[in-house]
Amino acid sequence: MKLSDRRLAQRFSLAIPLYIRAWKSPAPEQKVESVNVSECGAYFETDTPPSEGTMMQIRLDMPREVTGDPTVEWRCTGKVMRVQPARFPGTLLGVSVRFDYYEVSRTADSLLALASSGRI
């Protein structure tokens, strides 16, 4: 079975900022860029990958192209499922995170846009 056949949700090829850190870590967030995102997880590249099995906190702003609404912030908790080696020497490592939990919150600007359109 192909990996794409096992996926539970549509993946969007989006290069958006992700703010990540190990669950309950006092360390500051690390900013990385997504390669793709779905409602079930995210894939990103980094030069300092977490270990497989690490629980992560991830924060991102999901764009209108995905949600159909003004930008909303997602706060996610997930588990690192896979760390892939760099494709070429000197490039970044790939990290796959499965979301176990997420909250979606609208920003004040997005709430105003929804209210002015009569959608809330």
Placement of each model-derived feature along the sequence:
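Structured alpha-helical
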Residues: M1-I120
